[in-house]
C-alpha cells in the first residue's frame, strides 16, 4: 500500500504545469530530488524481483537472484522531463552500462538478509581483461617483436669463449701454481749478483756514500792554530808545564802599554810577557817524561792603530805625565 501512495504522489497534476526548461541537471544543484510529475520506468537494468512479481505477500519467498542483465532490458529512463535532462541521463547511464560490460564477469550473490534482490559486481582489476581481443590487438607492445641480438645476426663479429674445459680453482691450487712459477725464477738468478751503485739492500750498508759537512782550512791544519795566553800559566793538561794543551789564558791589552809603564815592565818580566812560543820551545821547557804541547800560544795583536795617550796607567795619578787634559 505504501508503494501505491508513492505512485499517487508522483502523479500530482500541479507539477505538470511547470515549463520543461525549469528542470535541469547540473553539479551546482543542491536539491537532487526528482519533480513530482516524473515517472520512472525502471529503477535498475534488471529490475527489482519484488516489484516484478506484483503485489506479493510477505509470506511468499523471494524469487532467486537472476544473472547479469541482457541486451533486451531497457535502460534507465525518466518520463515527463525536458529533452536536455533526458539526453544527459541517457549519456550517463550509457557510460555506466559500458563500464559494466568491460568489468570482470564475476559476481557475488548478496546475503539473504539484504533482501536477496540485489547483485554486487566485483571491482574490476587493474590488469586488462585477457578475453578482450580488440585491446590486445590494438596495443603496440603486443605487435612489436623482440629485437634479434647482434651475435645471432652477425656471428662473425663475435668470438665465443667457453669455460667448460676449465677446472674450478681453489686457494690451495692458486698458491701451488704461484710457487711453481716462482721456483724456477729464483733458481735462475745469478749467484754473483752485484747491486747497482749505492743501491745495496742489506742492512749494514757497506759501500754506502756518506755525505758530511766539509771542514774549514783552519780546522784542517791544527798546527797553525793560534791561542792567546800568558807564558808560564799552568795548563789543564799538565799543571807543571807552561803552554800545555787546554791551558788557554785570558786576553790582555798589554801591547797598548807605553814603554816605561808598570804594565810594560810586568809583561816584560821573566814570568810574563807576550812572545811566540813554538813547538820546539814547548819541548825545551817541558819536564823530562812530559808530553809536548799540542798548540802554540802567541800574543794578541790588533789590526787598528790606537793612540796610547788615551790610556791611563794602572798605578798612575792625574799628575803623571801624559794625563793632562
Swiss-Prot record:
Residues 237-249 have a biased composition (Gly residues). One of its GO terms (biological process) is spliceosomal tri-snRNP complex assembly. The modification Phosphoserine is found at residues 56, 63, 82, 91, 139, 261, 317. Its main location: nucleus. GO terms for molecular function: molecular sequestering activity; protein-containing complex binding. InterPro entries: TSSC4. Residues 80-90 have a biased composition (Polar residues). GO terms for cellular component: cytoplasm; nucleus; spliceosomal complex; U5 snRNP. Residues 1-153, 192-325 are annotated as: Disordered. The modification Phosphothreonine is found at residue 123. Residues 197-246 are annotated as: Hom4. Keywords: Acetylation, Cytoplasm, mRNA processing, mRNA splicing, Nucleus, Phosphoprotein, Spliceosome. It is found in: Nucleus; Cytoplasm. Residues 73-100 are annotated as: Hom2. Residues 18-36, 101-110 have a biased composition (Low complexity). The modification N6-acetyllysine is found at residue 213. Residues 145-312 are annotated as: Interaction with SNRNP200. Residues 302-313 have a biased composition (Basic residues). Interacts in a RNA-independent manner with distinct U5 snRNP-containing complexes, the mono-U5 snRNP and the post-splicing U5 snRNP-PRPF19 complex. Interacts with SNRNP200; the interaction is direct, excludes recruitment of C9ORF78 and WBP4 to SNRNP200 and negatively regulates its RNA helicase activity. Interacts with PRPF8; the interaction is direct. This is U5 small nuclear ribonucleoprotein TSSC4. It comes from Bos taurus (Bovine).
